Amino acid sequence: MQIWVDADACPNVIKEVLFRAADRTGMMVTLVANQPLKTPPSKFIRTVQVASGFDVADNEIVQRVEKNDLVITADIPLAAEVIEKGGIALNPRGERYTPDTIRERLNMRDFMDTMRASGIQTGGPNTLNQRDRQQFANELDKWLQQARNQAK
């Protein structure tokens, strides 16, 4: 098991949480992005740079993810594909997607796309706050504990 990060849009503060967790637990963290990334030196952190283009990083993650791997992404369609392959999807705010919640989120995303296409201003998500970071860290710790238990 390992952690995959949709790194182009992942907040730096969340990457830092992941870097600390990788070194603390020995869990491999792979950041996938279409641009070069700076990471701390660690044998548990690696980067994969893909070509620029729509969904290229997402497709790379979907190809590589395995059952029970954790994927960090705010991209709803990517999260849906990860779940379909048996992976776990967690967004940077600490929301762990399930088969039920991902369907609901896909429907809401499609609805919002339709509204934006008709000219309605929908706004974006709120700024990541301390509570979000704590929720993310808590969910990450839960997954890491499950991974340790399965490895025994």
Curated annotation (Swiss-Prot):
Sequence similarity: Belongs to the UPF0178 family.
What Pfam families does the annotation carry?
DUF188
What is this protein's record name?
Answer: UPF0178 protein YPO3033/y1450/YP_2656
- Name the NCBIfam families on file: PRK00124.1
Native source species? Yersinia pestis
